[in-house]
Amino acid sequence: MERVWEAYGLTEEEYRKILKTLKREPNHVELGVLGALWSEHCSYKSSKKHLKKFPTKAEWVVQGPGENAGVVKIDEKVWVAFKVESHNHPSYIEPFHGAATGVGGIIRDVLSMGARPIALADSLRFGEFNYHETKRLVKGVVSGISFYGNCIGVPTVAGETVFEPSYKTNPLVNAFCLGVIPAGRMYRARATREGQLLFLIGSSTGRDGIFGAVMASGEFSEDVEEKRPNVQIGDPYFGKKLVEAIMEIVEKDLIVGMQDLGAAGLAGSASEIAAKSEKGVELYLENVPLREKDMNPYEILLSESQERMLLVVEEENVEKVKEIANKWHLEGAVVGKITDDDTFRAYYKGELVAELPVSLIVDEAPVYDRPYKEPEYMKEVRNFNQEELPQTDVKEALKKLLSSPNISCKEWVYTQYDYQVGTNTLLIPGHDAAVLRLKWVLRPELTTEKGIAISSEGNGRMVYLNPYEGGKFVVAEVCRNLACVGAKPLAITDCLNFGNPERPEIMWQFVKAVEGMAEACEELGIPVVSGNVSLYNETVEKNEIRNVFPTPIVVGVGVLEKAEKYTPSKVEKESELYLVGNLEENLRLDGSEYLKVIHGLIKGDVPPVDLEKEKILINLLISFNNKELITCAHDVSVGGLLIALLEMVFRTPYGLEVEVYTDERPDVFFFSENPTRVIIGVESDKAEEVKNAVEKAGLEWMYIGKTTEEKKIKVTFNGDTLLEDELEEYEKLWRTSLEKLLGST
């Protein structure tokens, strides 16, 4: 038998399943549809079994996983929809366009729920700067994100950028979007009866992005030139017009449901609507507005051209929808209808070019229970004893850490984004979480005094060292960040970036990370309402397989009772500084930036998260914010305590005086990244009340210093002065190091 299935990304076993169901050989177009919809990117065939472990329900959850975005209640007037998604493979091939279309795609996911997009965030991973392509990739990706986000008028308010060798030839570009919905006005990818029409609105259809879903479900080789046509090209100006047109259509209640056109194009969107509606669908491909000549049915069905949406419309509303499309200078045409059988049919100029059971395309996509086993490297990385590390000079170590691209200021990145467009951003990038007000310009009666907070986190290094504990570590940090600004965590969305699931060692990383994340979500009472899985993040380079660190990215959304009542991460007034949280756990350097930068090691085990104490700390921080008992709060994370303290005073008028007494080694105390620890600023007249509240909650506190009016830093450790300098030289290192690495200064 000719191995025809391989060209469509199918396995022989999958092809035999298709033959058995159809009782005939599928044609070229049908194979294209099945190859795209059965790809890992669309079907989640390796991960679906394990994703069921996540908690997804809560009284404030309106829509959990299974739709284009999750939806949660903010109050009786406002809901929010949000999701994070990857665009990793396209961003390596074409950094600018890959990243830009990643932003466009996630905006349309949220838009398809009937939500107006109001905020973006991104989580980026690149190789280190000794790799010649890193500068090009960073500049291209950041330019692509800023181009699309700035032009479409949605602020990029949060994110993170990390550099590790494992991402050298496989960068990770994860984009998040959040939108607001009037309560009760949510849409789904659904039809309600046969005879309803499918209306394609937006840009015209070209050949860009064909095979995009299949490409995103395979490993890379060094030669990516041949894959460039698989990368979609986005147009944010067209995207902006599409947003406004959809908002007008929704406001006038002219549609039944909608679905954006993303992976697998029209074939994917139409079959998903049919499957979720338990109906069939007919498509008339000659009606699709085209931008290129001589496109064949295969190309029309599977094109992933951007800025397109598929609307379910009653026949009597078609002309009204067309008028709105014309008003916004968008293409618009009826391209199909809903039928009462379980069949996907595509016609081209009267000829039937594809006929498949909807259930086969969507519901019967294979689900694999892949084998998994602990990788051999685990024995090597666990062989670590921090007591054997040589003592280092704290001052020199601090300077090296401030120069690390993982710690140095990311202003070069986020100042390219317009994070204030829309004038709703109250707490800008550089804090533990962004804070936004929920303001409706056109519908002031829907404005609420509540605010939302957004935080994005990932720690591939920790997950690599212990996927189970690392999964807990990441979820806990996101929730802690939200609480630091005073927000109650409501829900998370995740993007699970892993290597090839056909390798048992990679599948073990995935399974254990999901289990750890699920446990943290259960214990902290945080549902997972949406997400994305990105597998096959590996590169074959000179016959050597290079896998990325297992990298679950978690974006959390929280609510503040009053938008303007938040806690900043920066010092805004003179304060005493206290470390609060779980201070009884032995401090460890395992997996820390200090261990990597100063000692060249990625070793150890993940410092465990005490989820019970984490939950107490989260509630305590929210209480402190509501009672206005603290002046600032910042969690101890990458770089450790001393880095966190400096981050709180950099870009402020204040200096820092650190004074600690402990039995720990100086390097362990200052650079450990143990979780469940937060630095808070307290005015002296409120210190006793705060300390009493910490003790009453069952947590620990430690006085670690104070801010000063003089812009200096002084660190004393058990009575010995370790450093005493002008703060400016440390701040300059932190502020300029990344720009210098990028050749921008």
UniProtKB/Swiss-Prot annotation:
Pathway: Purine metabolism; IMP biosynthesis via de novo pathway; 5-amino-1-(5-phospho-D-ribosyl)imidazole from N(2)-formyl-N(1)-(5-phospho-D-ribosyl)glycinamide: step 1/2. CDD domains: PurL_repeat1, PurL_repeat2. Substrate binds at S86, H87, N88, H89, R108, Q232, E304, S305, Q306, S534. Monomer. Part of the FGAM synthase complex composed of 1 PurL, 1 PurQ and 2 PurS subunits. Mg(2+) 2 binds at D109, D260. It is an enzyme of class 6 (ligase). ATP binds at Y44, K83, D494, G531. The gene is purL. It comes from the Bacteria. Part of the phosphoribosylformylglycinamidine synthase complex involved in the purines biosynthetic pathway. Catalyzes the ATP-dependent conversion of formylglycinamide ribonucleotide (FGAR) and glutamine to yield formylglycinamidine ribonucleotide (FGAM) and glutamate. The FGAM synthase complex is composed of three subunits. PurQ produces an ammonia molecule by converting glutamine to glutamate. PurL transfers the ammonia molecule to FGAR to form FGAM in an ATP-dependent manner. One of its GO terms (biological process) is purine nucleotide biosynthetic process. PANTHER family: PHOSPHORIBOSYLFORMYLGLYCINAMIDINE SYNTHASE SUBUNIT PURL. GO terms for molecular function: ATP binding; magnesium ion binding; phosphoribosylformylglycinamidine synthase activity. Pfam families: AIRS (PF00586), AIRS_C (PF02769), FGAR-AT_linker (PF18072). Keywords: ATP-binding, Cytoplasm, Ligase, Magnesium, Metal-binding, Nucleotide-binding, Purine biosynthesis. It catalyses: N(2)-formyl-N(1)-(5-phospho-beta-D-ribosyl)glycinamide + L-glutamine + ATP + H2O = 2-formamido-N(1)-(5-O-phospho-beta-D-ribosyl)acetamidine + L-glutamate + ADP + phosphate + H(+). This is Phosphoribosylformylglycinamidine synthase subunit PurL. It comes from Aquifex aeolicus (strain VF5). Belongs to the FGAMS family.
